[in-house]
Amino acid sequence: MSAHEDLVGRIQAHLRGRGELTEGRVLDGDGYFLDGRLVVAVMGSDLCIEIGKDQWDDTLASEGVTPFLFAELPVPGWVMIDGGSLSSDESLSHWIETSLARR
């Protein structure tokens, strides 16, 4: 199983039963939506989430976190979490819950 497939399975398990879970393409990744709203996107083995502009600078100081880039420019309020930082269910849960708090 690839790192991408493993991450997708863990995300699905975490979100299952919390609303209507749907999947769809988002830019270069696979988006996971609850009740029609994007929660996370998986791009390769990395995770993309919205954390909000108010938390952006503080979140970027976290290990394994970089700005999400669109057309080579950072998108304020959106971050990428390196797949290596998501090896534990606890770390993945933290980032999913951070994204859900923005809903």
Predicted regions: what is each one?
Residues 1-103:
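Charge-dense, helix-prone N-terminal extensions
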